[in-house]
Amino acid sequence: MLQVNVELKERRYPITIGAGLLGDPNSYSSLKAGDKVMIVSNPTVAAHYLATVTNTLNGLGCSVDSVLIPDGEKYKTLDSLNMIFTALLEKNHNRDTTLIALGGGVIGDVAGYAAASYQRGIRFIQIPTTLLAQVDSSVGGKTAVNHPLGKNMIGAFYQPISVIIDTNTLQTLPKREVSAGLAEVIKYGAIFDIHFFEWLESNIHHLVALKQNELEYCIQRCCQLKADVVARDETEKGDRALLNLGHTFGHAIEAHLGYGNWLHGEAVSVGMLEAAELSRILGDLSAQDVSRLERLLAQAVLPTISPDGMEPSEYLPYMWRDKKVLGGQLRLVLLKSLGKAYVTAQASEQQVLSAIERFTQREFHE
């Protein structure tokens, strides 16, 4: 078992990583006999893990209820949020309740925002069951739901009291979801740590195959990198924005296709390449490093060209709605080199379009 601590100005919380944690009472040290718990999950995850978590908490003397919301990014909505509120109210939960998010990034985001909002805030625990959620979305307190006009437009910064990462949950994860998580893993190396990027180049096949030792190291390293930046910049006023490499481009893909048609990690994969190519156009990143990133993403079984039929100009309306737009300027996370990212507003719209064009479906432009 491994542990990473997220050190905030006012408090800290643990991220625990290991196999078999869901059924281990020691994983729930922040709960005690008599505590009220509401578990938020979806039918797919609940079929595998809800009984284990419920039985373990009952064994601790907790009173446990659960609510299931539909599965998928297209259900990361105010309607799903309202389902959670209704369940909490119908079961007479109050400010003493602890809400548990049992699932992937959608569950974590919606349940986290419910915890931030219900009776002005209740405690919550993240139990991420996808690789993407384990290395990224469950850590750091970003919670949100989508709006038809943009992703994550309604939300709050709200930190969990703990994160429990049971690597056994990855064994039931579809291979496509594993690859989507690896996009965020590769992102950490690209923005913060060239040595980790090089380790990934040597070990990506072990991660695709879900080898336990490599997985645990990878998850721990990603969580540590995320914890470090969250400790410096909890509410994304500075360095934390670097975690959005590829996301401005990627969110445009997701919104254009309709949420859920491409997985978030798949869209971020292409978005990172478009950001890398823009970095090359601006004179920062070498063509060789763009190719290294492209090769690593391909080895992770991720898309490396934009969706069929999506023209470069179709990105722009979504990109201009991005939360990082300030003072009428499109601010993008780019790469000085592999392992070093920065934020700039210096790229022209034509340069952005040229970068997107480089990774647009070949047959569409022939």
From Swiss-Prot:
<keyword id="KW-0170">Cobalt</keyword>
<feature type="binding site">
    <location>
        <begin position="105"/>
        <end position="109"/>
    </location>
    <ligand>
        <name>NAD(+)</name>
    </ligand>
</feature>
<comment type="function">
    <text>Catalyzes the conversion of 3-deoxy-D-arabino-heptulosonate 7-phosphate (DAHP) to dehydroquinate (DHQ).</text>
</comment>
<keyword id="KW-0547">Nucleotide-binding</keyword>
<dbReference type="Pfam" id="PF24621">
    <property type="entry name" value="DHQS_C"/>
</dbReference>
<keyword id="KW-0028">Amino-acid biosynthesis</keyword>
<dbReference type="InterPro" id="IPR050071">
    <property type="entry name" value="Dehydroquinate_synthase"/>
</dbReference>
<keyword id="KW-0456">Lyase</keyword>
<feature type="binding site">
    <location>
        <begin position="71"/>
        <end position="76"/>
    </location>
    <ligand>
        <name>NAD(+)</name>
    </ligand>
</feature>
<feature type="binding site">
    <location>
        <begin position="129"/>
        <end position="130"/>
    </location>
    <ligand>
        <name>NAD(+)</name>
    </ligand>
</feature>
<feature type="binding site">
    <location>
        <position position="151"/>
    </location>
    <ligand>
        <name>NAD(+)</name>
    </ligand>
</feature>
<keyword id="KW-0862">Zinc</keyword>
<dbReference type="GO" id="GO:0008652">
    <property type="term" value="P:amino acid biosynthetic process"/>
</dbReference>
<dbReference type="InterPro" id="IPR030960">
    <property type="entry name" value="DHQS/DOIS_N"/>
</dbReference>
<feature type="binding site">
    <location>
        <position position="247"/>
    </location>
    <ligand>
        <name>Zn(2+)</name>
    </ligand>
</feature>
<dbReference type="InterPro" id="IPR030963">
    <property type="entry name" value="DHQ_synth_fam"/>
</dbReference>
<dbReference type="InterPro" id="IPR056179">
    <property type="entry name" value="DHQS_C"/>
</dbReference>
<feature type="binding site">
    <location>
        <position position="184"/>
    </location>
    <ligand>
        <name>Zn(2+)</name>
    </ligand>
</feature>
<keyword id="KW-0057">Aromatic amino acid biosynthesis</keyword>
<dbReference type="GO" id="GO:0009423">
    <property type="term" value="P:chorismate biosynthetic process"/>
</dbReference>
<comment type="similarity">
    <text>Belongs to the sugar phosphate cyclases superfamily. Dehydroquinate synthase family.</text>
</comment>
<dbReference type="GO" id="GO:0046872">
    <property type="term" value="F:metal ion binding"/>
</dbReference>
<comment type="pathway">
    <text>Metabolic intermediate biosynthesis; chorismate biosynthesis; chorismate from D-erythrose 4-phosphate and phosphoenolpyruvate: step 2/7.</text>
</comment>
<keyword id="KW-0963">Cytoplasm</keyword>
<dbReference type="GO" id="GO:0003856">
    <property type="term" value="F:3-dehydroquinate synthase activity"/>
</dbReference>
<feature type="binding site">
    <location>
        <position position="264"/>
    </location>
    <ligand>
        <name>Zn(2+)</name>
    </ligand>
</feature>
<dbReference type="GO" id="GO:0000166">
    <property type="term" value="F:nucleotide binding"/>
</dbReference>
<dbReference type="InterPro" id="IPR016037">
    <property type="entry name" value="DHQ_synth_AroB"/>
</dbReference>
<dbReference type="Pfam" id="PF01761">
    <property type="entry name" value="DHQ_synthase"/>
</dbReference>
<keyword id="KW-0479">Metal-binding</keyword>
<dbReference type="GO" id="GO:0005737">
    <property type="term" value="C:cytoplasm"/>
</dbReference>
<feature type="binding site">
    <location>
        <position position="142"/>
    </location>
    <ligand>
        <name>NAD(+)</name>
    </ligand>
</feature>
<keyword id="KW-0520">NAD</keyword>
<feature type="binding site">
    <location>
        <begin position="169"/>
        <end position="172"/>
    </location>
    <ligand>
        <name>NAD(+)</name>
    </ligand>
</feature>
<protein>
    <recommendedName>
        <fullName>3-dehydroquinate synthase</fullName>
        <ecNumber>4.2.3.4</ecNumber>
    </recommendedName>
</protein>
<dbReference type="GO" id="GO:0009073">
    <property type="term" value="P:aromatic amino acid family biosynthetic process"/>
</dbReference>
